[in-house]
Amino acid sequence: QRNELLSDKQITNRKRFGRLLFTNIFIHINQRENIDDLSFELFEKEYKVLKNYLPNNISNILDIGCGLGIINIFLQQHYNTNLKFFLIDKNRVDLKIKYGFNENYESYNDLRETKKLLSNNDIKKENIFIIDADKQINIDYTIELVISLKSMGYHYPYEKYLPLLKKVTSKDCTFIFDLASERYKDFEILKKHFKELKVIYEEESIHPLKRVICSGLIKNI
């Protein structure tokens, strides 16, 4: 899911054969031998960006577009309490990967693997709630932290989940998510929904992003 984890030979194969053939045939060829270590190193860097902005004393985390959910392992270590994790993503592998921003984003996930990975890394199984984004979403807990890294607002409109967020989040909930810089050139639309927002990180790439922290979700519009 992350291009940063591709080896040089994989990048060459993707350019040579195209994204569709690469994704379905060649993606496991010439893979980095230490891919697991690199994945954790990548999300450790993500955690270091977030850690100074994380709220205190929370019980429930919602991760939208969780993928393998690795960031939640670092969040569990950060809080070191009996947190509950609600993980939303599509639960299928589509034939064609779409890069960048798309109204109908694609999926490359097996949520069973997500739950297995987290439970193997000191998160209790009973605290992992896997939610298929294509099905009805029911969350009976109050969420105090919402994260969405390179998903909501980056690959598809963040407004997609606003009705859910207004329903399940606390009044003091913290939201951390990525915005596609080319799509959201200013923050006027965000200011209609959040009382406070701040850019905490920017990434320049083919698909640049701004990571924002928001609070004060306005629920009556």
How does the language model describe each region?
Residues 102-136:
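S-adenosyl-L-methionine
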Residues 68-81:
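Conserved SAM-binding loop of SAM-dependent methyltransferases across substrates and taxa
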Residues 135-146:
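A short acidic, Gly/Pro-enriched loop at the edge of an enzyme's catalytic core
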Residues 2-54:
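Class I SAM-dependent methyltransferase Rossmann-like catalytic core
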Residues 159-171:
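A short glycine-rich, Lys/Arg-flanked "PGG" loop and its adjoining helix->strand segment in the class I
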Residues 144-157:
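A short SAM/SAH-binding and catalytic strip from SAM-dependent methyltransferases
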Residues 58-67:
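Conserved class I S-adenosyl-L-methionine
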Residues 172-180:
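Conserved beta-strand signature within the Rossmann-like core of class I S-adenosyl-L-methionine
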